[in-house]
Amino acid sequence: MSKNDKKNKQSGSSNMDQLKSEDILQAVVLGDSFDRKFAPITLEKPRTLLPLVNIPLLDYTLEFLAASGVQQIFVFCCAHASQIKEYIQSSRWHDLPGVQVICMTGSNCRTTGDALRGVYDAQVIQSDFILISGDVVSNMNLQKALQIHKDRRELDKNNIMTMVYKQASSTHRTRSKQDDTVIWCNRDTMQVVCYDNSPSKKKSSISVELFQKHPSIQMRYDLIDCHIDICSPEVLALFNDNFDFADIRKDFIHDILTSDLLDYKLSAYVLQGEYAARVKDLRTYHSVSKDIIHRWTFPMVPDNNFMCNSSYSLSRQMIYKEKNVKLLGDCLISDETVIGTQTEIGAGSIVSHSTIGRNCIIGKNVKINGSYIWDDVTIQDNAIIDHSIICNGSIIKSSSIIGRGSIIGFNVYIGQSKTLEPFSKITMAQYNEDEDDEELLEEYFKEINLNDDNNNNNNNNNENNKTNRWLMENELYNELVPRINDSIHDDIESDESGDEGDKSGGKIKNNKNNDDNPIEPDSVKFHREVGDTIRRGIIEKLPLENIQLEINGLKFAYDRDGLDCLTSILPVLLESSSSSSSTTDSVTPKELQQFIAGRISAFSPLLVKFSSEDSMVDLIFKIQDFCDENEKFKVVFQPILHQLYENDVISEEAIFEWAEEIEGDEEDDGFYLKKCKGFIDWLKSAEEESDDSDDSDDDDDDSDESD
């Protein structure tokens, strides 16, 4: 342990002197994964600081512990320890009331066992504690699990560890293929009697002798290991006494359960309806990201802004945006997308099922699908990014294609019209001469040239640095998306070789024509083709009946509904002018209002064909989202609504229902409700006058009948 760590430990101890040691709930966070499953990214940055939906992984773990009442958290750092310490010092964890986060370092640690022996040597753990990986995301009720662990300890002091599991199917998206756990446990006490974590094995067996002690044993293959353990101090002592313990699951648990000398017991705690998952490889990184976007991790979701340094808001289709995001022209932001502040997306670009960080510049006609774009990335016009990770500071030049499953490291420069084949891994990192396996590690790097073909007068710093292709092949299933041959390997041993063509880490070639788009999802294709149909109809002045026939054909071909059609038609009608050479960008609000009135009136027979009572409220919200993404239309939201009402595309009932839904929102939705107040009041007064007129007519009829 370094001098600074000793000082931190001493200051930490003095600050907690007022509390009795048994009253302090402590946790040990493993800040190192001791593997290369995120290489080459983790050659430059620790896994715990990698962004997951634009928030460092470590923040999810610390937030979970703090919310669970943990008062003292020790983060044990090994690789890139200085980065973790610097991050904690500069974050809210440095002085958060009620929670003390202390960094400990072990520069010579090579395994989890070494780290736990380091914690033992520090003598900072006083009682039962939480042992957790620094890449865990959870919203579980930890206090309930702690109480069950304490109750078990009172009954039997030899019950030294409770392991947390989540019930899920064997094919669940957050279940890593390399963490294929089978446990055998006492049905009544949940004591674990046998543990098997061998993905290559086709069957699991148990000793018959165990049934003499445990008459009722159940086999559980429906559990995901959350890597959250509630431990007694004896666990650290056992690691200190056994230097051959390198891994908790493979060594410690196996030894405890099979030892004839030790009488220690391990138990399981199974979550019901709560969330916990570890981001242990690229596949689970993708899965947990989707779970966060779909709000399974609530309250740790983007729009809850739980780290107090973000400004996300949620709109329909699971789209999260921070403030000061610029969406230009007719760019399309599709489902399951997160966009950080100060990011700009150019006209004609399509972003779907992706996370984009802060301060990114996305050019025109860029296509990004299923990808993770971190902070300060530049992607120029006509580039295609397919299910890939682009790390901070990288530059992707125009017309380049990043194949599915690729990883682009920090500050990498991809030249114009370059194509990276699927599962390429590119890094600016160089092999470390201080590594123990220097010769082996050097073999993982191969220098490549990704600069522009005509690279005579470029001043970009990224271009002039040495770029390497990372050649270390990932373990089976450890890719952001499945390889084609993954399904083949489901039925064979995991140590057999995969597709030889992928071992090079991906080839690079020039791309002069990327018209064929290999990544466009059906929803995006439909939106684009309907938009093209409307634009062609405007320019060529086609009859509305012909346009309707074409859109109906697309509707059935892509299995879309009327609302999908309207949300694809309206943006084009509003953005495009009657002349193909002019747009709405330079007109005044009054001119824009007049243009909208004429355009909606002219196309109302077409719009009515796709409108239905069931979808009218949703259509209003879609128009609101469109105005959010296109600032110039915010001021004419009410005229758009008015024209759609006048032309029977939406009803007054739908407008009333929309207003009722957003009433009380003073920020985002409140702006639109305020804009429409006069129009809604007019509708209500007109409705009341109509009701009064109807009542008067009824009275006249009654009097006539009485006469």
Swiss-Prot record:
Annotated GO biological process: cytoplasmic translational initiation
Gene Ontology cellular-component terms for this entry are: cytosol; eukaryotic translation initiation factor 2B complex
Q: Where is this region: Disordered?
A: 489-526, 686-707
InterPro entries per record = ARM-type_fold, eIF-2B_epsilon_N, eIF2B_epsilon, NTP_transferase_dom, Nucleotide-diphossugar_trans, W2_domain, W2_eIF2B_epsilon
Q: Where in the cell is it found?
A: Cytoplasm, Cytosol
Q: Which UniProt keywords apply?
A: Cytoplasm, Transferase
Domain W2: from-to ranges: 516-693
The record's Pfam families line, in alphabetical order, gives:
LbH_EIF2B, NTP_transferase, W2
Q: Which domain of life is it from?
A: Eukaryota
| Record GO terms (molecular function) | guanyl-nucleotide exchange factor activity; transferase activity; translation initiation factor activity; translation initiation factor binding
Acidic residues: compositionally biased ranges: 688-707
* Function as written in the Swiss-Prot or TrEMBL entry: Acts as a component of the translation initiation factor 2B (eIF2B) complex, which catalyzes the exchange of GDP for GTP on eukaryotic initiation factor 2 (eIF2) gamma subunit. Its guanine nucleotide exchange factor activity is repressed when bound to eIF2 complex phosphorylated on the alpha subunit, thereby limiting the amount of methionyl-initiator methionine tRNA available to the ribosome and consequently global translation is repressed.
Q: Indicate the family of this protein.
A: Belongs to the eIF-2B gamma/epsilon subunits family.
What interactions and quaternary structure are annotated?
Answer: Component of the translation initiation factor 2B (eIF2B) complex which is a heterodecamer of two sets of five different subunits: alpha, beta, gamma, delta and epsilon. Subunits alpha, beta and delta comprise a regulatory subcomplex and subunits epsilon and gamma comprise a catalytic subcomplex. Within the complex, the hexameric regulatory complex resides at the center, with the two heterodimeric catalytic subcomplexes bound on opposite sides.
Q: What is this protein called?
A: Translation initiation factor eIF2B subunit epsilon
| Designated gene of the protein | eif2b5
